[in-house]
């Protein structure tokens, strides 16, 4: 019972442990300080001990913060259209998204246009028109503490949900291996054989209302020979051919324009 410290030291030597030595101030020497394992879940508990110094703790926390920032997915860039309609010869765009460097705009008829991929969030911009800085009064503006007026734009994910849905649909339809231009069903190589009744079938009978061709009718004595009787509506927009006589073929067609009917005759020598 009286030699407890010596027994404890012997047990620690058998287990392979080494008791850290402390200096006169009560701290642990540099050679005996526990090592930091960066990927170990027990690293955070090391800083709760009194042996860890403040600069080392701040260094580890800064490293851990940078690691968390790198693990976050970057914001998706969204195509954003900038348009200047105020005229001019040379128009440039400058904003917080490109560190206020001048970007030339492309002329489109009377307008100047640029399409940029911007991350989601709030962005300020301005136009440089013919050597003078200006803003678009028709777009939202913001005024700084120094009195500078800039245009402001909000790039939101919700504004592109329709385009994202269309992109997903196009990706789903991009695989054309499952598509076929032929209708479903079995196919064979047997030739088509027409039935006897189909082979000797007579042409369809001419409808009876088309037999009354107004060109074949005789006009009465009291009628103007240059005028024809009013045709039936079923006779319109049909091409009629007269039997060839004296080497001439006659074609006719009747059309209606509002309340008038016009019959055209074409004579073609054969």
Swiss-Prot record:
For this protein, what is any one GO molecular function term? protein kinase binding
Post-translational modification note: Phosphorylated when associated with the catalytic subunit (PRKAA1 or PRKAA2). Phosphorylated by ULK1; leading to negatively regulate AMPK activity and suggesting the existence of a regulatory feedback loop between ULK1 and AMPK.
- One cellular component (GO) term of this entry: nucleotide-activated protein kinase complex
Give the UniProt tissue specificity note. Highly expressed in kidney, heart, white adipose tissue, lung and spleen.
Residues where N6-succinyllysine occurs? Answer: 201
Outcome recorded upon mutating residue 150 to Q = Significantly reduces glycogen-binding
User: Which residue positions does Phosphoserine occur at?
Assistant: 5-6, 24-25, 40, 96, 101, 108, 182
Q: Name one GO biological process term.
A: cellular response to nutrient levels
Name the keywords, alphabetized. Answer: Fatty acid biosynthesis, Fatty acid metabolism, Lipid biosynthesis, Lipid metabolism, Lipoprotein, Myristate, Phosphoprotein
Outcome reported for the amino acid change (mutating residue 126 to Q)? Abolishes glycogen-binding
Region Disordered, annotated ranges = 1-43
Q: Where is this region: Glycogen-binding domain?
A: 68-163
Query: Which residues are connected by disulfide bridges in this protein?
Result: none
Outline what the protein does: Non-catalytic subunit of AMP-activated protein kinase (AMPK), an energy sensor protein kinase that plays a key role in regulating cellular energy metabolism. In response to reduction of intracellular ATP levels, AMPK activates energy-producing pathways and inhibits energy-consuming processes: inhibits protein, carbohydrate and lipid biosynthesis, as well as cell growth and proliferation. AMPK acts via direct phosphorylation of metabolic enzymes, and by longer-term effects via phosphorylation of transcription regulators.
Q: How does it assemble?
A: AMPK is a heterotrimer of an alpha catalytic subunit (PRKAA1 or PRKAA2), a beta (PRKAB1 or PRKAB2) and a gamma non-catalytic subunits (PRKAG1, PRKAG2 or PRKAG3). Interacts with FNIP1 and FNIP2.
Regarding protein family, the annotation reads: Belongs to the 5'-AMP-activated protein kinase beta subunit family.
Q: What is this protein called?
A: 5'-AMP-activated protein kinase subunit beta-1
């Amino acid at each position: 019972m009286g030699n407890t410290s010596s027994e404890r030291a012997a047990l620690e030597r058998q287990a392979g442990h080494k008791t850290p030595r402390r200096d006169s101030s009560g701290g642990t020497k540099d050679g005996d300080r526990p090592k930091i394992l960066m990927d170990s879940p027990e690293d955070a508990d090391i800083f709760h001990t009194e042996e860890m110094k403040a600069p080392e703790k701040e260094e580890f926390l800064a490293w851990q913060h940078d690691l968390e920032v790198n693990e976050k997915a970057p914001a998706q860039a969204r195509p954003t259209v900038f348009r200047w309609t105020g005229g001019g010869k040379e128009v440039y765009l400058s904003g917080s998204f490109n560190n206020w460097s001048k970007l030339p705009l492309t002329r489109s008829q009377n307008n100047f246009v640029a399409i940029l991929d911007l991350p989601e969030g709030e962005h300020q911009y301005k136009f440089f028109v013919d050597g003078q800085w200006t803003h678009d009064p028709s777009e939202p503006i913001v005024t700084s503490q120094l009195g500078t007026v800039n245009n402001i734009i909000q790039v939101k994910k919700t504004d592109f949900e329709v385009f994202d849905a269309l992109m997903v649909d196009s990706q789903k339809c991009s695989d054309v291996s499952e598509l076929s231009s032929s209708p479903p069903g079995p196919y064979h190589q047997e030739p088509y054989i027409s039935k006897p009744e189909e082979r000797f079938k007579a042409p369809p009978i001419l409808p009876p209302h088309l037999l009354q061709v107004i060109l074949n009718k005789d006009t009465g004595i009291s009628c103007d020979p240059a005028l024809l009787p009013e045709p039936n509506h079923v006779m319109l927009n049909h091409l009629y051919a007269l039997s060839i006589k004296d080497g001439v073929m006659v074609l006719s067609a009747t059309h209606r324009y509002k309340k008038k009917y016009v019959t055209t005759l074409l004579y073609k020598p054969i």
